Structures are given as C-alpha cells and as structure tokens.
Amino acid sequence: MRIGILGGTFDPIHLGHINPALDVKQQLHLDQIWLMPNHIPPHKNTTVVSTHHRLEMVKLVCQQYPEFKLCDIEINRDTPSYSVTTLTLLTQQYPDDEFFFIMGMDSFVQLPLWYQWQSLFNLCHIALCQRPGWAMDTNSEMTKELLFRQATADYLDSPSHAKNGRIFTINSQLVDISSTEIRQQLAQNIDISTVLSQTTTEYIRQHQLYR
C-alpha cells in the first residue's frame, strides 16, 4: 500500500490538517492517510487538553473520513516523537508498504533542525503541501534539496520506482488557521465550526474543551 503519514499534536485537529491530507491522497493516488498524534511528555505540558481527548478527536475524524486511519505508534511511546525513529519502526513493521511523510513548506525549510533529518529520505518520500504561488528562497539549502529530489506523481507509475527519497509538491488550498487561533476563539465562545469537522465540533462542545 501507499500510505501518507500526517503527524501533529492535533490540539484540536482541524481542516488545516484534514484538507491538505485529502489533497495528498488524491494527487498521489495513495491508499490511506494515517493520522499520527504526537507523544507529549507530561512534564512539558505543551498541550491544552489531555492525550485522551486529542486521541478521541482523531478517532472521530477517522470515523467521519474513511480515507483516514489512526496511527497511535507515537502517542503510546514514552520517548520523544522523533520522526526518523517513528518511520524506522513503521518501515520495519510494514516492509511492503510505501510511506509518504506529509508536511508544509514552513516545516520543510526547518528540516535541517530535525533529529537525523537526512535519514528520512532513506525511509520515505515527502509530500510537500504548498499554497499556490508560494515560493522558497532560491538560496536556501532546502531549495537545493527540493530541486534534487523533486518528482511528479507520474514517477510512481513506474514498477521499478524507489520507495523512498523523493519529494512530491502538492498544490493545496490550505486553511489559514492554526490550532492556537482555534483555541483562542473557542475560549471567547466564537463559532469556529467552519474550520473543524462536524465530529470534532460536537466532541469539543460535549466535553466543554478549550473554555
């Protein structure tokens, strides 16, 4: 199978996560998208709601969207969520599958700061979501990386194509809102149902989260 991996704190999960993931699936003809909530050490206290609530909201989104599947490999671990460690485990557990790590341009340009970031290309492809008309700095280290590794969806049609190491740029109508902004608006009792899935909106109301 061809599987997209989208990680995040999902505090809460919103259409800014969901829509680009659906675009990736459609444009690269993937079989599934796995939503992977990050592990947050209790002492860091960097999320607003509990791990339980974050996990339940993702489960509900997976029920609403059959294209999605919950991947709990990180959230059940007691160690930091290094992407390269997670993808190493996934490729060992699912050696016949092909993984596409989904990220935005803002994360991609910061990739050299990630733990063993270059090893990612030995484990997966990268599906890079960009807003139409968005351009990288031509002198950036990651611009050179992108030009070297860039491929189109046609590349995947070849039976002998490599299962890792390529970057696919995805044109996506990104929802310009963050989880932080959503939490702030919820705290002010502002209706934000247009940027949340129906199941997430109902869950937040039912459990009175982010108040």
Swiss-Prot record:
InterPro entries: Cyt_trans-like, NadD/NMNAT, Rossmann-like_a/b/a_fold
EC numbers for this chain: 2.7.7.18
MF term (GO), any: ATP binding
SUPFAM superfamilies: Nucleotidylyl transferase (SSF52374)
Catalyzed reactions: nicotinate beta-D-ribonucleotide + ATP + H(+) = deamido-NAD(+) + diphosphate
UniProt keywords, alphabetically: ATP-binding, NAD, Nucleotide-binding, Nucleotidyltransferase, Pyridine nucleotide biosynthesis, Transferase
Signal peptide positions (record): none
GO BP annotation list: NAD biosynthetic process
Source superkingdom: Bacteria
Pathway annotation: Cofactor biosynthesis; NAD(+) biosynthesis; deamido-NAD(+) from nicotinate D-ribonucleotide: step 1/1
Pfam family, one: CTP_transf_like
First-tier enzyme category under EC: transferase
Protein role: Catalyzes the reversible adenylation of nicotinate mononucleotide (NaMN) to nicotinic acid adenine dinucleotide (NaAD).
Entry's family note: Belongs to the NadD family.
The protein's name: Probable nicotinate-nucleotide adenylyltransferase
Originating species: Shewanella frigidimarina (strain NCIMB 400)
Gene (UniProt): nadD
